[in-house]
Amino acid sequence: MKDSNRCCCGQFTNQHIPPLPSATPSKNEEESKQVETQPEKWSVAKHTQSYPTDSYGVLEFQGGGYSNKAMYIRVSYDTKPDSLLHLMVKDWQLELPKLLISVHGGLQNFEMQPKLKQVFGKGLIKAAMTTGAWIFTGGVSTGVISHVGDALKDHSSKSRGRVCAIGIAPWGIVENKEDLVGKDVTRVYQTMSNPLSKLSVLNNSHTHFILADNGTLGKYGAEVKLRRLLEKHISLQKINTRLGQGVPLVGLVVEGGPNVVSIVLEYLQEEPPIPVVICDGSGRASDILSFAHKYCEEGGIINESLREQLLVTIQKTFNYNKAQSHQLFAIIMECMKKKELVTVFRMGSEGQQDIEMAILTALLKGTNVSAPDQLSLALAWNRVDIARSQIFVFGPHWPPLGSLAPPTDSKATEKEKKPPMATTKGGRGKGKGKKKGKVKEEVEEETDPRKIELLNWVNALEQAMLDALVLDRVDFVKLLIENGVNMQHFLTIPRLEELYNTRLGPPNTLHLLVRDVKKSNLPPDYHISLIDIGLVLEYLMGGAYRCNYTRKNFRTLYNNLFGPKRPKALKLLGMEDDEPPAKGKKKKKKKKEEEIDIDVDDPAVSRFQYPFHELMVWAVLMKRQKMAVFLWQRGEESMAKALVACKLYKAMAHESSESDLVDDISQDLDNNSKDFGQLALELLDQSYKHDEQIAMKLLTYELKNWSNSTCLKLAVAAKHRDFIAHTCSQMLLTDMWMGRLRMRKNPGLKVIMGILLPPTILFLEFRTYDDFSYQTSKENEDGKEKEEENTDANADAGSRKGDEENEHKKQRSIPIGTKICEFYNAPIVKFWFYTISYLGYLLLFNYVILVRMDGWPSLQEWIVISYIVSLALEKIREILMSEPGKLSQKIKVWLQEYWNITDLVAISTFMIGAILRLQNQPYMGYGRVIYCVDIIFWYIRVLDIFGVNKYLGPYVMMIGKMMIDMLYFVVIMLVVLMSFGVARQAILHPEEKPSWKLARNIFYMPYWMIYGEVFADQIDLYAMEINPPCGENLYDEEGKRLPPCIPGAWLTPALMACYLLVANILLVNLLIAVFNNTFFEVKSISNQVWKFQRYQLIMTFHDRPVLPPPMIILSHIYIIIMRLSGRCRKKREGDQEERDRGLKLFLSDEELKRLHEFEEQCVQEHFREKEDEQQSSSDERIRVTSERVENMSMRLEEINERETFMKTSLQTVDLRLAQLEELSNRMVNALENLAGIDRSDLIQARSRASSECEATYLLRQSSINSADGYSLYRYHFNGEELLFEDTSLSTSPGTGVRKKTCSFRIKEEKDVKTHLVPECQNSLHLSLGTSTSATPDGSHLAVDDLKNAEESKLGPDIGISKEDDERQTDSKKEETISPSLNKTDVIHGQDKSDVQNTQLTVETTNIEGTISYPLEETKITRYFPDETINACKTMKSRSFVYSRGRKLVGGVNQDVEYSSITDQQLTTEWQCQVQKITRSHSTDIPYIVSEAAVQAEHKEQFADMQDEHHVAEAIPRIPRLSLTITDRNGMENLLSVKPDQTLGFPSLRSKSLHGHPRNVKSIQGKLDRSGHASSVSSLVIVSGMTAEEKKVKKEKASTETEC
């Protein structure tokens, strides 16, 4: 009955909020008045009112394993979706998703298979994490949402990042919702639900909740419309500004009811349609949809047999009648019309290992978009596996025609993204018009559709490449390169600038570097140009590095392409439009040729020769390490690229450490630098293993793209000691160090002998041109000349080893003049020549300052002065001939060397001293003192010479590092020294006057105390005897007044003790420890240090003139003459200048190509080896093994499950077979003792039962979702308990004749089995109403099945028990009918007295039976008698009314007495007496009925007759069912039972028996099969059984028949 105080909204009327006058519109007022005046149907729109939300903030979930927080808001059900999205993005700080997964399923709790749940959870989380998706759910902890919550909980406990899971739930069904009321509050929310409440708690694994309120309480539906609109609105948003794709939406269905099928249909009918993924095996709706998807053909057509099976499944699953099931079936078929949009995930099926692949594949296949759009989606999700398997299915080949048609918006996007190109074309045309005055012919427009489509595909691939680079998707860049993107065609100047100006991807410090280089504050939207990048590269590379972006030809091109104010721009850059030829003489010929070749209108002009070079530098400057490493592997000059990246990263790390940036940035950059340095070293090692000579060429060939440098120079610039210390580099340096000399032992001694005794030069060994591991430009020329002059000798000069004849041949082939020239040009000879000269200079300098100095310099002093002046000229030459272009940069680079600074100080000091020395006294004395100080610097300079020695070189570096350490120590020492010095001076000398001596006195004594001089006599002034005594008013022995004592003088010794403890013990030992650390640090890398210093030394002497100072002035004069006279020759040579005469090799294009190929092969082989090494590493093996073990364990679990199921099944079969044998034996024995049954009938019945059992088995096997089709049955058979399984009968709910049925009590066991135990004892009832009057040839038996909807799937139970403690426990379900026999029940022609006189007493054992039927096997089917399913059906001992001559007999006896009223009313057992009879006698059946039963029978008789009449009209006349046995007396028997017992038979059987008339014999056989015992005995119901009756065995009539 409806509660009058409760409103339709679900709340009590007194809980309603009165409407606010101000907030209520006039329309609502009128409506509210109308509601008051006249009643109308309640609706949300009319009877609810919106208010500003009063519930939003943060939830803190309690009651779980750990505390979670979630944002929440309560909104109206009709809130606009754009407002909600604005809230989510702005207030909740959520990033727009790249994918939206909407999960739908059952709201009621259900169990998922553990393995399926694990796969579902992992796949869902992986899909969300890898793509940056949002997950929409119902938000409450029931049904599918709880399974999603479990997956989220597992994920959040294992990783930091939480998946964005948004629960959209109705406000009215949320438990404890009153706790959430409050604006911008933090509320504690209890997740423990109240078992008595119909409301649900929110799931604590979600991150956000949107609670839709439509004014109702305890009702779902408020969120449905809001959720759909919000999903649609989000799907219209763009993934990001670069990708034109909207946010893709996919529906995920797990389990669910009929409403889920409707949701699927809505998704599929949306415009555009939304793909749906169905999780097969989760139950109910998802299983039905997946079944239909599997067997349905295109267009929603399904086979007729499968159609019937599907309808049966729908009826059984959802408890639907035929009309409802047909309606739902129609919806499913409508869904199947768009079968291509539905993806079914089946666990363990081929090709679908994970549900996340099913979700992402469904989006690509389901949405009918072009290949470029699919590529954009895969790129947005960062799922290269999806792109490779779904989009690039044709590999590098072109896709088929028609699959590429890009939508119009993508073309528009393409145009928008290339604004510079339009400018470029205009600029190019203008530039060319000025220069050449020609107009380029228009290219004909392409009309071939295939070519247009392929061009669009190429454009789409290039756009995807740009997006992949911007978004830092390394795998996608690799995939696109593998699938046909031409990087040389792709990379243009505008695109490269766009990459440098992107704000996406990892954070970088490029803007800070540009600001430092430009030395000005840049606006936030400053557009970085490539010229800016060139300046940054030069700044970071340092030294003489010159970037291509800052060279004149590139700047001219750049301004022609993009500069609207071209002449002004060129002028600002220090350039002019047309340079005169005279100025061009100073330019390199190569540069001039490049400028002549520039065709501004050529599309290839804005592209790059080596695109991977430019992209790798971009990746390094943008701090994209993975991308940089990938781009390094591609393209040419890998070794040079690695060294450039190493240097750039190191310089960026240095800049970061000096600025206010976080230390982590500097550390990361330093690590990246080490990574690239290691790559360069490994590549050098790989090359050296393959071919030593080519590896040396790699080190020395000119890198035209890297400032015409070499790999060795780049390694030195990057201070890559390991690279320089590599065997290959050292072999090269050794060859260079020795020049043309061939000396294996004691080279220094031989060279000194050659210098001091020039004739010995002729006895030294020399190498020919072909023995060199390197070729400089000058030696290249000399070698060519020698090839012309000495072809015979060069033919032999292939190796260093040979016999003596070849050696003599080689030596004779080198002229004496060449030997002398090569000897003095060798760096080792120059080194010793300079060293001897320097030592001579030092000796003379010592002599000059040690002897008396005259007014005019002596000869020795003039030699010293000339040496230093010539040395100063040499330093000037070094500066002028260094690589940098500008003089300021030359000086800056020169000063970066510490020894150059020492030379500068020493020369400058000496010059000042020399000028003062030439003056008169006292200035001459000052000059001499400056000489004396200056010689210190010249002695220090000797340390540089030690660098050539393997052992002394590292010590020089240690000294330099220790000096830096000591500077820090001096600062600390100064603090301690000052603290003691000032205190001591102030205490001991209180009356000092101001003077500079005070400053000296502060430091004087404390400083020397550090070294152990403690001035013992002055520690305590008055303790020593030497000091005079002091005191106030005291006199000495001579009577003189003693001086007063200094106050506080006693403090001095105490302060001194503390000072010495800190200074001498602590600080000095600290300094020693620091020095020790530095020593071991350098000692560990001493070999690399020495080799690195050796490079510097060799390069220094390689470039120096032959003669040492002061004779070097001759070399300078020679150089000037050669430069003035040799310009024409240099033009013929090419672009070689003096500064290029270093360790550099110039190769032809063909040689360069071969060298690049060799280098690329080495890179590939190196990475192949690393990959093999990684795969064979223990970590990788452990990982692979663990994966395999995990897979094996999962399979073993499956096998164990199957094995357990098979064992259970086999045990069941064994039990049933054993019972079958026993029951068969009992039946045979009983039937043999029962009169009236022919043996032939028995055999026929048994054979019939076995044949039909097979058909039933097949039907049961075809049942859908019959994973566990067994139920447990209990029989108490003479005190024995037998357990076996039965799948006998399936009943259909509500289709039989309505009769009073048995009532049951359901016992829920922990296992899947269901036991049904009868609550009350049942009465066998013969339904013989007036409407079904007996006919001469038949009888009618109508029985019904269960009535309750919950028990609609259950077959009836018939219990026959002796136990007295069984009682009726459920009075509501107990319905009994007292059987009665009317006059109409008696067959025509038979006397009523015959019935009463026929008595039969039957003795039987007590049988208690509990029958249950599998829930999953219920089918709605019409069974006919000849097709009756009899799969091991178990019925209790039945006795039916028997008649002779097809006449029904029955007897009623009202004279039975009960021992008590309780026995009369609550007797719960059948108690029968059996009297043995013979065929020759006939007895009457006394019908015993209690008064209560009679009254109950009279009350319900009329209704039953009406029901029977209603059924009889629809059923044709058939022979009345009876089991007949003829006896001699012609008497008939009737089974009569207690009236308070009702026997229910399945309505199926009632229908089948009514449907087709059969002869009596066949029906009897079927009933015998079904466990109905035929008896010719009179049954009399008595109130108890005696012990004697229990002993009766062979007279028993109870039989139970099984197949």
From Swiss-Prot:
Residues 1182-1240 form a coiled coil. GO terms for molecular function: calcium channel activity; monoatomic cation transmembrane transporter activity. Residues 852-897, 950-961, 1076-1105 are extracellular. Keywords: Cell membrane, Cell projection, Coiled coil, Congenital stationary night blindness, Disease variant, Endoplasmic reticulum, Glycoprotein, Ion channel, Ion transport, Ligand-gated ion channel, Membrane, Receptor, Sensory transduction, Transmembrane, Transmembrane helix, Transport, Vision. GO terms for cellular component: axon; endoplasmic reticulum; endoplasmic reticulum membrane; plasma membrane. The keyword Iron-sulfur does not apply. Belongs to the transient receptor (TC 1.A.4) family. LTrpC subfamily. TRPM1 sub-subfamily. This is Transient receptor potential cation channel subfamily M member 1. It comes from Homo sapiens (Human). The lineage of its organism: Eukaryota, Metazoa, Chordata, Craniata, Vertebrata. The gene is TRPM1.
